[in-house]
UniProtKB/Swiss-Prot annotation:
This protein's name: Protein synthesis inhibitor II
Gene name, Swiss-Prot/TrEMBL: RIP30A
Family to which the UniProt record says this protein belongs: Belongs to the ribosome-inactivating protein family. Type 1 RIP subfamily.
Main location: cytoplasm
A single GO molecular function term of this UniProt record: toxin activity
Length: 280
């Protein structure tokens, strides 16, 4: 069982986005999240890196995202871990916190399904079937904000909630992790786009989304200082992601997951640098 989280109700920051806003506003919203999450003392190829997940402690570093279906609405609040960008909960209009990991968030109600794409879609390959766009974002926000306790017993309502969570994961969480995804979504929100423009990610982006840790590790390996007389490690191409060079990896990632790689920063050292640079 998960250790109960701390500080879910005391976010490090809150980022707000109005679903009707422009693609430029969306880009600013996502860039702002990356900027606030990064370890100020750690970059890879000029890309920000998250501080490490602290070992053996319950998650205690959180941020909130508030998504408003209209400028005057109260908005749907998402609770997201600041160390790995995992979506763990959302708050419906009746004040209920719904959690995706049973027993993680104090006082929350388990939504009835987990937050992995296997839980949500049955198969990670189905990510390429998920339609994204302004209408989908609005529908997702409306569905989760309007959720009631009775919905958990309804098959159709549970399916609607699964689809809504998947939409938000791609348009917020994966968009924060990947410049490719945020660029794709920004294109769908472009004011010149047809009013109801939607799109689906392709196979390369699907592989990226499913391989954030692998891609982060591959880029971090190229940062390791080589022994005297040796040249730095070359980037190992990841063909299914369409990423063949370190430069392409840096252009794909929005922020790296911290991964310990041989000869690189340790968890302890990265945390020390994070705290020394004012990280909370």
């Amino acid at each position: 069982a998960a250790k109960m989280a701390k500080n879910v109700d005391k976010p490090l920051f809150t980022a707000t986005f109005n679903v009707q806003a422009s693609s430029a506003d969306y880009a600013t919203f996502i860039a702002g999240i990356r900027n606030k999450l990064r370890n100020p003392a750690h970059f890879s190829h000029n890309e920000p890196v998250l501080p490490p997940v602290e070992p053996n402690v319950p998650p205690s570093r959180w941020f909130h995202v508030v998504l408003k279906a209209s400028p005057t609405s109260a908005g749907l609040t998402l609770a997201i871990r600041a160390d790995n960008i995992y979506l763990e909960g959302f708050k419906s209009s009746d004040g209920t916190w719904w959690e995706l990991t049973p027993g993680l968030i104090p006082g929350a109600t388990y939504v009835g399904f987990g937050g992995t794409y296997r839980d949500l879609l049955g198969d990670t390959d189905k990510l390429t079937n998920v339609a994204l766009g302004r209408q989908q974002l609005e529908d997702a926000v409306t569905a989760l904000h309007g959720r009631t306790k009775a919905d958990k017993a309804s098959g159709p309502k549970q399916q609607q909630a699964r689809e809504a969570v998947t939409t938000l994961l791609l348009m917020v969480n994966e968009a924060t992790r990947f410049q490719t995804v945020s660029g794709f979504v920004a294109g769908l929100l472009h004011p010149k786009a047809v009013e109801k423009k939607s799109g689906k990610i392709g196979n390369e982006m699907k592989a990226q989304v499913n391989g954030w840790q692998d891609l982060s590790a591959a880029l971090l390996k190229t940062d390791v200082k080589p022994p005297p007389g040796k040249s730095p490690a070359k980037f190992t191409p990841i063909e299914k992601m369409g990423v063949r060079t370190a430069e392409q990896a840096a252009a794909t990632l929005g922020i790296l997951l911290f991964v310990e790689v041989p000869g690189g920063l340790t968890v302890a050292k990265a945390l020390e640098l994070f705290h020394a640079s004012g990280g909370k």
